[in-house]
Amino acid sequence: MYRVIFNGMNILAKSNNISWSSDTDTLGMQVTFDSLVNLTEGSIISFLINNKEYFRGIIIKKSESKFSYNYTAMDYSFYFKNEVIKQFNGIKASSAITSLLKEYGISSEIVNIPTTINKIYKQSINDIIEDILKQAEEDQGIKYFKEMNINTLVVKRLQDMRIKPKVIIGSDITIESSIEEMKNKILIVSSEESNKSIYATIQDKNNINKFGLLQKIESVEEKNRAQAKNIARNLLKQYNKAIKSTSINLLGIKNAETIRANRLIELNVANKLKGWDKIKSANHTLSNNKHNVTIELEW
């Protein structure tokens, strides 16, 4: 059912305490495990579930004890930390990401993203892609995300990522609600220091009366001025609410490996959870033939 492959050999029998995690706020997926096998940093390992390759990555950290080794492996997004120079002139976002990755020999599967990108970048590959997706989300009002699928970067729409694993839900849950990130007024201004123009303003008067003024200022370039009102509307929709979250322990029965960050899952728990909620983070542990998952939901 599970295999850990190094140089064509299954080393699972000599390995234990396998865990893996993904989070919307981190660069990629990481796998940690203990093993009697001595691997070197930079070695490539694969993790297979039901004969399907689920993870491929590089050993980036190693610690040695008296009788065994502990390893941390990261998927190929490890290389997205490379800093580059790239200019885009009126190219749609999906084509911009494809062009960037192709230049550095990285294969990709990118959903169509029509937002136009006009910008010069001097930063990491990851930061460039994050900025492009941020522009697209503000322009389209659609949540996009990226992740590595073996050796291919995939960019998809969150709304398309519904999963239905079979799990046993743990004990009662606690739901937290926060207005720390709430914004009920949005100003779109010029990114040029000499230009003090306000391109668009949108606010929720009812929420301002209830919570007080919580304002966000977003800067855009002059050439994107026509999108200002649309960006303001989408930002208000994104920020003008209390954020709810909860952490849940699950025992995986079937297809638990599909549980990862940037998925929508439906867990009906009494009157506390109904409908499809976003997985912000997922932490898996595989020990003694039990697959346990702790997830953080956010909505």
Model-derived features with residue positions:
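Short, acidic/charged, Gly/Pro-enriched secondary-structure junctions
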Residues: 1-5, 34-64, 92-103, 256-282
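Sec/Tat-exported extracytoplasmic proteins
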Residues: 104, 133-136, 140, 190, ...
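Short beta-strand-centered interaction patches in the first periplasmic/extracellular domains
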Residues: 68-69, 110-181
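Assembly/oligomerization scaffold segments
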Residues: 1-80, 167-175
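Oligomerization/assembly interface segments of phage tail-like spikes and tubes
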Residues: 22-35, 67-78, 188, 241-252, ...
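Well-ordered beta-strand positions in beta-sheet-rich domains
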Residues: 53-58, 70, 85, 199, ...
